[in-house]
């Protein structure tokens, strides 16, 4: 059997293979509520054979949405439709996961197909918050620097969102601390210029993420895993670095984090990112090698043999696929056939199974 299709157990949750649906924003919600689009989008990837389906960045507070069209989990009223999604995913033999997020200074923007520009409060947007009053790009409105009460609210919002996620049936929680959103903004000295207990030193800049992890882990049953997505580097001198990520991974491991989802960038506009096939795998490999903590590799993983090589050579424990699963929701089934592994197909689709000659 191909390494890509061996099971992986994280705490009390076993993934049937090493293919994970990476969280991908659909910008298709209204007031945070999921709808049929999200059910079909996530459900079809579960039908397609992925082991873990992680729902897109789901806002822990309304002001934490990237766009007015983001999913949310800040009120109990969001839960009934989310339960439909998790039940369907589980019925296909996959594990439902959710990425909890706060967009920080990158909140209150339009969706990509609407131009991605900021939405003013008069147009349905809202004031944004960040560690420091520094806009992501100079042309945008500067965010408000969070005070202690605001920081305490962020921590409480993540914990409350975790409780709701459990009530909705999610079995894996991922904290979004990457891509220039709030928790990443606190990590990087390029966006965090505070002089209090949350700025300056490595320990201070990582304090908020540590407190969020502790709050979420306290809410989670011991048998359920906790993931953290990190941008392993800002790709800019003076920013968050790969060395920082290794050091932070060791800290997070001690706080009960079970896997680091290794992405990069997003905190510096026009950063010189060397985008190419598997360009972020090296960061997953390094964190795994130097800490012993399981990792996930993500970013332009588009080929069955490429994914197999990543897992087989111990560079990462799982691969997270995004664009490739938009192109082919049934990539896991097709990859298994290509790699010579026989997987059960949904009985409704059995007539479409490729036959070996």
Identify the residue ranges that each predicted region occupies.
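Flavin-dependent oxidoreductase catalytic cores
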Residues: 1-357
